[in-house]
Structures are given as structure tokens and as C-alpha cells.
A protein has these predicted regions:
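Flexible coil/turn and secondary-structure edge motifs
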Residues: 2-191
């Protein structure tokens, strides 16, 4: 058995399942956030965290239909949220920092809406991939509620990550590929 095989076996045996073994022998984790239109969410995370080595993809999570299409999700009938899945190296960027940024770049006090976008597919949600992520998300949420949203209630759902379905190819990195097109008016830094 090669050293790489033994290392992989050891790494996958000792770490929680939400972590994956990268080709650079480092561990990566996933973070999944819903905060309105996924184009704007992806654009904001890439703008501020690409330098930290994150990779992103947009898709659908939290619904009751397998392999939903954009049209189905937009109808509101599938219960999916438009979401961003981030793969990150926790040695380069901490999960807590990604969660705090999530609250900074959208309005977590509006139920099933962000700016002009309305419907459950635009809800504010953190989909955690481990008990540790849940604990961190709850702690950061309480801190942000106290510090930034006194008098307004954060309505963000903190729920287990289920199956994430990749959105259609044309949605991936949409605002990067269409820089003079639509801008998401609800995604900006609030503090």
C-alpha cells in the first residue's frame, strides 16, 4: 500500500465526513448558504474569498424533488432554496468567517425574500455539514443578532445540509460571465 493510500485511509477514518481529501494533501470542507438570488451570493463570496482558495457552485437544496430545474424551483413548488456551495480549506479561511460574511452581505431579517426577489427559494438559510458547523452557525448568529440586528429578528434557518443539486451550467459564475448584465441589488456589505 502506498504512502498516499495509507494517508488517505487514515485521514478519512479520523475526520468527520463533511471533509474531503484534496489533491494537495490538505483537508477541505463544504459550506452551503442560501441568501436570495444565488448569482449575487456567489459573486460576493468569490469577490472577497477567492484569494483564500475557495471554489463555488450554485444549485438547489432543501427541497422535496430530485434533480429540480431552475423553472421548477422558481415556481416555489419544490421547496428548494437557491444556494451556494463553497469548498474551502479551514486552514486558509475559518467557517465562522464565512458565516459572519453571510450575514454581512444580505438581509437575514426578511422572510422568504431578498430585495425584489420573493418566494421560499430566496429564503435565508445555513445548511450545515457537521455538528461543529451547526454549533458555529448558531454562535455566530447569536453574536450578529446582538451586535447588528437589535430590534429586528434574524429569520435565517439553520438546518442540516441534504442533497445539493447543481444548477444549470449557465447559472455558474453568472455575474462573472455577464459583468454588464443583471446586478443583485440586495447583496452588499452592511457593516
Amino acid at each position: 500500500m502506498s504512502l498516499l493510500s495509507r494517508t488517505f485511509q487514515l485521514a478519512t477514518h479520523l475526520v468527520p465526513s463533511q471533509r474531503t481529501f484534496s489533491t494537495t494533501l490538505g483537508m477541505t470542507e463544504k459550506a452551503t448558504f442560501a441568501a436570495g438570488c444565488f448569482w449575487g451570493v456567489e459573486h460576493m463570496y468569490n469577490k472577497y474569498f477567492k484569494k483564500d482558495g475557495i471554489t463555488t457552485k450554485v444549485g438547489y437544496i432543501g427541497g422535496k424533488v430530485d434533480n429540480p430545474t431552475y423553472k421548477q424551483v422558481c415556481s416555489g413548488a419544490t421547496d428548494h432554496a437557491e444556494a451556494l456551495e463553497i469548498t474551502f480549506d479551514p486552514k486558509r479561511v475559518e467557517y465562522a468567517k464565512l458565516v459572519e460574511f453571510f450575514y454581512n452581505m444580505h438581509d437575514p431579517t426578511t422572510l422568504n425574500a431578498q430585495g425584489p426577489d420573493r418566494g421560499t427559494q430566496y429564503r435565508s438559510a445555513i445548511f450545515y455539514h457537521s455538528p461543529e458547523q451547526k454549533e458555529i452557525a448558531e454562535k455566530v448568529t447569536a453574536e450578529v443578532q446582538e451586535k447588528h440586528y437589535k430590534g429586528k429578528k434574524i429569520v435565517t434557518e439553520i438546518v442540516p445540509a441534504g442533497v445539493f443539486y447543481d444548477a444549470e451550467t449557465y447559472h455558474q459564475l453568472y455575474l462573472e460571465k455577464n459583468p454588464s448584465g443583471y446586478e443583485c441589488p440586495s447583496h452588499f456589505l452592511r457593516w
